[in-house]
Amino acid sequence: MVSLQKLEIELQELFKQKQYSKVIFEITSQTEDEERSSSLCNLLGLSRISNDNKNKDSLSMALRDFKQGYLKEKNTNHAIDCLANFITSSVLLMDLEKDYKFDFSEIINFYESTEKFCINHRPINLAMAMVYRRLNDAKKLILHFKRLIESKKFDSKDLCNYGYWRCFDKDWKQSDFFNFGKFLDQNLKVIPQDQLEEISKEPGPKIRIGFLSADILGGHSITYFLKTILSNYDKKKFEIILILNNPKEDHFTKNFKDLVDETIDIWNLDNVSAVNRVRGLKLDIMIDLMGYTSMNRIEMLKSRTARKQIIWMGYCNTTGLTNMDYIISDPNLIRSNEEKFYAEKVIYLPKIWNSHCGFDLERIENPPPFLKNKFFTFGSFNNFDKINSDVISVWSNILKKINNSKLILKTSKIKHGLERLKALFKENGVLESITFMGREKEFKDHLNAYNEIDIALDTFPYNGVTTSFEAIWMGVPVLTMAGYNFNSRCGESINKNLGMD
């Protein structure tokens, strides 16, 4: 036992030095499976997934190591660490290998048998949130982020994830979002002022506006809402700077760079460097297109990057930041008596808060499909994350009330949560009326799929925006439910501006 303990101490030092291959060799050559403690199994698995030669085989072997370590010493700290890494590595392998099939029930059973010992365990909660994200179970995902918040074991990313996923939760009122936003603002790290450059107060010959985004690539939805604006601004009065926070770039990115006066990339910059880099641009206005969404720079924005900061498009709710001056909305989304529940001052565009640029594709007018089908077809091409139990209940009732009607559900993320959705629709007795479709290879084929739909159904409380504009562009009306805040009234605003309310 003493020799194994000594070996483990030596191996821990090698691991810190990132000599992963040597750690793997020493453990596998000097110990047998049955000799290894949970901590040694964990070290072996971590070395396999940290190694430069990481692949499907190494991940699979790491899974075996983590599982072995968990089962050897259940409910000990080392075993719980193994479980966290087992779950995380399972999700990683799922994402890397399209054909990889994993038994989610095993993960969930392991977790439930250990839950009371790890309610406040940060890696476990993060890992289980990843699992429920892929199972399209927002309610349980939220639970694990809530535990992180309550245990005070969180960072800014956890806070943003929790706030973002609450947008899928009908039980949160706008006052809850407002209070959480204040909590987030109070708990973000503050950059000492002596580390920051001064914000320029001298007006320049033109108004300089920065747009901050991680999503100017790959045909991301935000590009369709931003393109017309950047193509038509008055270059005599304005200078536009794209501030990109993504290491990737494609032809969409290049096209957008050609539309503006300047582009900078802050992906590799820490918050202090990023704030100073942006302050050096001498912006009059910074428009954040991300809010709480993935790859955001919320900590940077807390420290103010321009004279005025505005949240728009990418996140349809309050950020809670005291330094976020404005939120762009419209009268349909935020009522005047609700402004108190938004940390930002509301800028009301007269009709609609944003507009889609459409597509460079020829549209062919088609008759409604029910004329040839002799039955009515509903459809939703929204992300499956937005389809909760209440949405399923409402849609199921619609199918039951309209004789022989059908429903087409289509999403690019169909892999892991599909069986859960099918089970919920089956419970409601309508599964046989539903067709599930995956991602189309060509975007034109995605749009043409709308020709199979008579009416598009919107999700709630998290409305579709891009999918609603797509449906309308293809001549398909959208049935939406009136909401209670910005996020849940997007469909309402779109329809009201079309005179379809």
What are these regions (language model features)?
Residues K237-E239, S396-E427, L431-E432:
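A conserved nucleotide-sugar
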Residues N448, I455, T459-D501:
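Catalytic binding pocket for nucleotide-activated donors in carbohydrate/polymer assembly enzymes
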Residues K227, D250-K254, I392, K415-K422, ...:
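Short, surface-exposed alpha-helical segments at coil->helix boundaries
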Residues L159-C160, L283, K374, L399-S405, ...:
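Short acidic (Asp/Glu) and glycine-rich catalytic loops that position anionic groups and cofactors
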Residues V275, S396-L399, K422, L447, ...:
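Generic hydrophobic alpha-helical scaffold/packing signal
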Residues D265-I266, N382-I387, S412-I414, K441, ...:
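Short, contiguous acidic/charged loop-to-helix segments that flank catalytic cores in large enzymes
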Residues M1-F375, N383, S393, E427-V430, ...:
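Alpha-helical solenoid repeat scaffolds of the TPR/TPR-like class and their adjacent stem/linker regions
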